[in-house]
Amino acid sequence: VAAKPLVDNIPTLPATVPLYYEDVSQQNFEASVLACLELSGEDIPEGATHGIVLDRTCFYPEGGGQEGDYGNLRCDSASHSILDTRKVGDLVLHLATGSFEVGDMVHGELDWSRRRQLMDHHTAVHIVGGAARRLLGPHIYQAGANKSVDSARLDITHHKRLSRQDLDEIESLANEVIQNVSRTEKMTLDRKDADRKYGFDLYQGGAPKGSDIRILRIADHDIQACGGTHHDEPGRIGQIRIVRSNAVQDGVERLHIVAG
């Protein structure tokens, strides 16, 4: 049985402008309310009552293994917490503790400490994956990943269990990358151009939908299709630790990562 959708009868609206791609460190913004929809689905945070659609937003919607942003939206007549952010088609839906009127101009503010930790962990997953590939061999492939506020996990394909020494070497190389690579490179390419230029290794995290592909490149260390939010400068992560690993199934190791 399919899960009940978050909202019923979504109106036809222009795609939400993703300010989180234009400036990943932007924490405040002004926007116009295009729709205010009562939430009716099953997977709704306790206290959230309405899904707010804006013309633009800094709030990153859950996707690609990265949790959605939290924060606050307010206008002259109301102020509501945002308890999660989701994507519905081309629209970003802010799950709010109350309603606004269509046409309201609102001020949005991110829960920045949460977003920063999510960025720490998401960028760290890419760096650790690249380090594992360089040290263990080109057979290393991302089989899955999850990034939360407190930690991240990365599932990689490998033919034997990883020792603590293996983990220490991967961790050491990952921290070298943080120190030595000054900037990450983010680009959007047409899918055919991306395939031609970089090959199908781009899609280790899964092939994204649409004709345009957003790509994260960390020097010659790692390059992947990824729609998440990432630090412009790897050094902002601070430090990466690989806490432990365990076997998820034959030939797949799960690395437990803490960054920041």
Q: What do the PLM-derived regions correspond to, one by one?
A:
Residues 1-260:
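A glycine- and charged-residue-rich anion-binding loop/surface
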